[in-house]
């Protein structure tokens, strides 16, 4: 699953969250957060945990699948 990194970083900035703090809030490792920010995919479970930590619906932070659109 691909996270919309631009939106994720905006939400982090708005909430004053560092990668470390987002990792703590979401229960996801800092390394995983860093990989996502650098464009890697993640599992739906990880995306969901990040969405919850950012107080967003999952659909708000996940990139839409343009191949099926």
Predicted regions and their residues:
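Alpha-helical and His/Cys-centered functional microenvironments
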Residues: 13, 34-35, 60
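Recognition helix of helix-turn-helix/homeodomain-like DNA-binding domains
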Residues: 28-42
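Short C-terminal boundary/hinge segments that cap the last helix of small helical domains
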Residues: 55-69
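A short, Lys/Arg-rich alpha-helix, primarily the initiator
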Residues: 1-18
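Short alpha-helical "recognition helix" segments of helix-turn-helix
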Residues: 22-23
């Amino acid at each position: 699953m691909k996270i919309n990194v631009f939106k994720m970083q905006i939400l982090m900035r708005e909430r004053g969250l560092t990668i470390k703090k987002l990792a703590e809030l979401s229960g996801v490792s800092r390394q995983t957060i860093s990989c996502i920010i650098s464009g890697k995919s993640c599992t739906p479970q990880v995306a969901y945990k990040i969405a919850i930590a950012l107080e967003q619906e999952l659909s708000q932070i996940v990139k839409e699948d343009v191949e099926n659109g």
